[in-house]
Design a protein with these regions (language model features):
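Single-residue signature of alpha-solenoid repeat helices
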Residues: 26, 66, 106, 146, ...
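C-terminal non-catalytic interaction modules
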Residues: 13, 276, 280-369, 373-375, ...
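Inward-facing hydrophobic residues that define packing positions of alpha-helical scaffold repeats
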Residues: 10, 30, 50, 70, ...
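Amphipathic alpha-helical segments of tetratricopeptide repeats
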Residues: 34-35, 71-82, 111-122, 151-161, ...
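Eukaryotic tandem repeat interaction scaffolds
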Residues: 171, 178-290
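Tandem amphipathic alpha-helical repeat scaffolds
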Residues: 7-22, 45-61, 85-101, 125-141, ...
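Amphipathic alpha-helices of TPR/Sel1-like and other helical repeat/solenoid scaffolds
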Residues: 1-2, 9, 16, 20-40, ...
């Protein structure tokens, strides 16, 4: 039913790269081809090669390089009059914005990318952009709003036999069930995702599915050793492909498994390691979750209750500000578990303020998809105005706080 997984973001002369190519190889080959295309004045090829370069930088956590690359890819696509290539560049930029915690900016860029994908007749970039919008909502905990979109995208991916996109959708739906307490349903979905990914030779998707299975085996069954074994298997793929972000999340999950088993010194070590990795790559969500695990471990090891309460209260405020609903709920559960009162209760209905990434890099809001003119030319003009405004603002400086907006490394 499913063919071998492929990477549609590797285009033009780079279609020989596979979904399992190491990011270092993608960056080297992409940069070489990009330079050749620029020297030859081949705008279409420059846009395509530039997209691969942008994605490699993004997944390696190199925010400034990724920021420059997606904008350059967009400009090359615009100069070539290639609306679909413009959409791919905006998809890359929107994904980068989401990973930096700039959720509103991410939604605008991804929404525009989906529209241009439809205008340009590229159903793949449209699907990827809609998936990006769905993932943005899921990360923020808005399950009701994006659950149906996940199901719709899963149905479309199954119908087309797209293994990679099917695996992504299954894992997203599984994670929502996991976070809602439906462990059995989540396990079945992660198991199916792992099976499809393995058959399609999608090592990245397989590693994420194994991580999800390990989480449930630990939380539901209390089977620590099996969970650690699944994480070890996933880590092999992460290291082989230099998947820094997936590896950091693997280490954080290993900390979760050890914490649940009461092995607090080991959990502290893993959370500390993951925290350093997330800070190095600028992944604010992973950084916050690692801090939470570390705080809980230190509390179990005898840390002063007042210090624990202060740390949890700070995390609650930060997560409230950047709009990560599920993570805020996790902090509240930790406060209850450890018997500490929140210094300042979080307000669930508070509207998140702009993150530093949004304040420093936000583009003027493009018109909603339904309000845009229906011609490719007008859509291209709208995209051009939005992307060019964005391109005038450099990426924000990295910081080391939870809300620091260096690029995250995503899937």
């Amino acid at each position: 039913m499913y063919g071998k997984a492929f990477a549609p973001e590797y285009q033009g002369a780079l279609t020989t790269l596979s979904v399992n190519s190491s990011l270092d190889d993608v960056l080297a080959v992409g940069t070489e081809r990009l330079r050749a295309a620029e020297q030859a004045g081949e705008h279409v090829e420059a846009a395509r090669s530039g997209l691969a370069v942008a994605e490699a930088h993004r997944r390696l956590g190199q925010v400034r390089e990724a920021d420059r690359a997606w904008k350059a890819s967009y400009r090359a696509a615009r100069d070539a009059g290639d609306v679909a290539a413009m959409a791919w560049a905006l998809w890359s930029g929107g994904t980068l914005a989401r990973q930096r915690g700039a959720f509103r900016l991410a939604r605008r860029l991804l929404g525009l990318a989906a529209e241009l994908g439809e205008q340009g007749g590229d159903i793949v970039v449209r699907g990827y952009s809609l998936a990006g919008l769905a993932e943005t909502g899921r990360i923020q905990g808005d399950y009701e709003a994006v659950g149906r979109l996940h199901e719709q995208l899963l149905a479309e991916a199954r119908r087309r036999g797209e293994a990679r996109h099917t695996v992504w959708a299954l894992e997203g739906i599984a994670q929502m069930h996991r976070n809602s307490g439906a462990h059995d349903t989540a396990y079945a979905l992660f198991e199916e995702a792992a099976r499809i990914a393995e058959g399609a030779e999608d090592r990245r998707g397989h590693a994420w599915a194994l991580r999800g299975l390990a989480d449930i085996v630990s939380a539901r069954d209390g089977d620590t050793e099996r969970a650690l074994g699944l994480l070890t298997e996933a880590e092999e793929s992460c290291r082989a492909m230099n998947l820094s972000g997936a590896l950091a999340y693997n280490h954080k999950m290993r900390g979760n498994v050890l914490y649940r088993a009461g092995r607090y010194p080991e959990a502290r070590q893993l959370y500390t390691q993951a925290l350093g990795e997330f800070r190095a790559m600028g992944e604010p969500r992973g950084e916050a979750l690692s801090r939470l695990g570390l705080t809980k471990s230190l509390a179990r090891l005898g840390r002063d209750r007042a210090e624990t309460a202060a740390e949890l209260a700070e995390l609650a405020r930060e997560l409230e500000r950047i709009g990560l609903r599920h993570a805020r709920e996790m902090v509240a559960r930790a406060q209850n578990e450890l018997g500490v009162e929140p210094a300042t209760p979080a307000t669930a209905t508070q509207t998140p303020t702009s993150t530093p990434a949004e304040a420093g890099a936000e583009a003027p809001a493009p018109a909603p998809a339904q309000a845009q003119a229906s011609t490719p030319a007008s859509a291209s003009a709208s995209a051009s105005a939005s992307a060019e405004a964005q391109a005038q603002t450099p990426a924000p400086e990295p910081t080391t706080t939870v809300s620091g907006e260096r690029a995250a490394v995503a899937r």
